[in-house]
Each structure stands twice: as C-alpha cells, then as structure tokens.
C-alpha cells in the first residue's frame, strides 16, 4: 500500500516523514490557500521534503478541459513527475483523456460515487480519490463507495488505483484499507491521532518504573 500526507505544511511533512513510511504528499487548492504561500513556492519545498522518490500531487483550477490541460502542463514543467489532480466533471474527464495522451499522470479527484470513479479510471487516471467522510456527510456510505470502486477497478481498470481521501478519524482510514484500498492520504490531525495512544505511554511508564525500581536506571 501507499501512505500519503494531505497537507502543504512543509515542516510537518519533514517531521512525519521521519516517522511514517510515506509515499508522498497530496495537496488541493484549499490546502495551498491555507498555507498562504504561492503554489510555485510551496510545491518545490514539498518535493524536497519528500525526496526525489516521493510523489507529489497538485490540482488544476480551470473549469474547462483546455484550461485544465494548460495548467497541468505548467505543473509538470515546474515539478517533473508531479501527479496532476483533475476534478471528475465532464470537462475533467475530457482533460484526463487528453493528459493521458500527453503522458501526464493524473488523479481523478472529488469523487463521490463508484461510477464517477470508474469513469475517471477508464478515461486514463492512474489514481482515483473517493472522498470518504464527505460521502458520509451527505448521507452516503464512504467505505462502501470505496469497496465498490475498488472492485470495479480490479475488474475493469486494473492499471488504476484507489487513493482514498477525506478522513476525520483513523478508524475510517483503517476501514478503507480493510476494504482493499491500495492507497490513502491522511490529513495531519488524523495522522497525529494514529500516533497519540495514551495506553502506550502508560505501558512504557510502567516498564520504566519497574526497571528503575530493580536496577536504579531507566537504561539498559
């Protein structure tokens, strides 16, 4: 599987990359806007933080296919190897098809249904990103959407993969992986929740207490 961080916070990427076996970083326009930095300044810094082998994702802003393709080429020229995120609208599907012919790797984003995700994959997107928590918030079942999409891709578009996004809890992320999802991207707060387990700290403190009581030190 592949684990990504969904952020434009370079310092946090550097910190968590030392801990997590991350494959790269995903961003979107809202994440970039929240960073208060120009996309052309923050993307190179993020790429440096994840290393040459790390995969970086950034999204186009245009609403029409030709504009999406133009922006995708601009992103590719700025960051060779970048994966361009394209919203899965009718214009987005047209752009994904054109970018496939141009050799630019894409991710179909803003996916709210398995059918929508399958169309993105068939159009040529290497990655498809269902929005798990947002589907739940609209009264749907985000995990079931991932299960259905994963099954559809395995049958009809095996060269594409699910990269699930939009998580509020570690449980949602784990349920996606149990559903067969190959990749997930975690916001910083969810990634941190995976690390913060009070019971673990209590167990370690007990070990230290017992060891110190017996040997007068907390080291070997």
Curated annotation (Swiss-Prot):
Read off the Pfam families from this record.
Answer: TAL_FSA
This protein's assembly is summarised as: Homodecamer.
Q: Which family does it belong to?
A: Belongs to the transaldolase family. Type 3A subfamily.
> Where primarily located?
cytoplasm
- EC number(s) of the enzyme? 4.1.2.-
User: What role is this protein assigned?
Assistant: Catalyzes the reversible formation of fructose 6-phosphate from dihydroxyacetone and D-glyceraldehyde 3-phosphate via an aldolization reaction.
Active site location: 85 (schiff-base intermediate with substrate)
One example of a Gene Ontology biological process annotation = fructose metabolic process
What is the name of this protein? Fructose-6-phosphate aldolase 2
This protein's record includes keyword Lyase: yes
* InterPro entries, per database record: Aldolase_TIM (IPR013785), F6P_aldolase (IPR023001), TAL/FSA (IPR001585), Transaldolase_3B/F6P_aldolase (IPR004731), Transaldolase_AS (IPR018225), TSA/FSA_arc/bac (IPR033919)
Source organism of the structure: Escherichia coli O6:H1 (strain CFT073 / ATCC 700928 / UPEC)
Q: Which domain of life is it from?
A: Bacteria
Q: Drop me one GO molecular function for this one.
A: fructose 6-phosphate aldolase activity
- Keywords in alphabetical order: Carbohydrate metabolism, Cytoplasm, Lyase, Schiff base
